[in-house]
């Protein structure tokens, strides 16, 4: 199984308004097949006032820029007809400050006032979140509310059973529309507060209990249809913490994998890779999801600038266990730098054509990193026999021939400075992989390796 993250606005435009949409995605199934995609993750497609969509106004409707609910259903049907599953990004921790629930809460209306978290007189309103020292309490019209992701995204109160039930209703609605599952955004933030003291504090026990409940509901809905649910969680934390959430949800993005390989390629030496494999890719009760990057990170090609090194990254990605995910355009070498206050540079329009002009090409924003005729387009990559895209297509074919890798694990890891070797097995099948990340030849365990080579025995 291979996953593919799509930022809807940037991928494929079906009506020439410059904005990617559901029908554009449906029209792209031939491309998905070429790169071996089995499951697509859509970033938020709901009604939202922002370009990124993570602050939601209505969980039960689509962003009209992307199409109607009927267009969404048509896209789902087309993907399913071509053997491709769909998971949707679901931010359940917070809503937009323009959401009807929050507007009613600000007016003091019941039951909506109890959907949110309000400051008490003894709270320290200068309390900040851990990772960047931003305030978590926000004052408006004489009321102070909790919003760990900013004042425009007030947190929901999951100590209120009504809020929990609303979240389960949202899951059921989209599962009944045909989605195969979810990417659960900010999973450790459902309970990230001490309600008695007004402090920012993760409660992993309560979070995991909630996700067990959510997955029980999702499986129940799918069971009535004779189908399975696929869900993946975002928990950016130590592997030991990730394990707890992943066990509940079934699959989790492996941030350490992405960080370790990027750092190793930048600075030389495989020690981070070895540590990552030992801590995250052993035998688990869940599937890890190793990935090239996402919308919250610098683009792969902006960190690993040599195409040969990016080919090594994809070799590592495709020979390790679980469900590998490709961030749209990473298979082409798209570039982009992430800024926490301005993430548009990592979500530029997907370049179908060398000229950035043609049927299906999105153009909702001016490009900064991926300009015309710079080599990172489908058209240009397909014209080269040695391109990164062609390499990814080859790895996709390998993955299709070895579907057992989804449920495998890594063992017997050995290494020198620039080479790592590892065995991948599911107990019945197995491969031995040798990877040289250096720009010079290496010989390890009697195996001769060319520069930047991934060899399977």
Segments and roles (model prediction):
Residues 174-175, 180-184:
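Active-site regions of oxyanion-processing enzymes, predominantly non-cytosolic
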Residues 9-11, 47-48, 92-93, 180, ...:
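Short, solvent-exposed loop/turn segments at secondary-structure junctions
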Residues 201-230, 235-236, 240-270, 339-359:
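Extended substrate-binding grooves/exosites of carbohydrate-active enzymes
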Residues 37, 179, 187, 322-323:
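A structural motif
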Residues 1-168, 172, 176, 189-242:
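Acidic/aromatic-lined carbohydrate-recognition and catalytic surfaces
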Residues 103-145, 263-281, 348-373:
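Core domains of carbohydrate- and sulfate-ester-processing enzymes
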Residues 219-223, 246, 273-275, 279-285, ...:
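Loop/helix patches that line or flank the sugar-binding groove of alpha-linked glycan CAZymes
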Residues 40, 182-184, 326:
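Hydrophobic residues within beta-strands of alpha/beta enzymes
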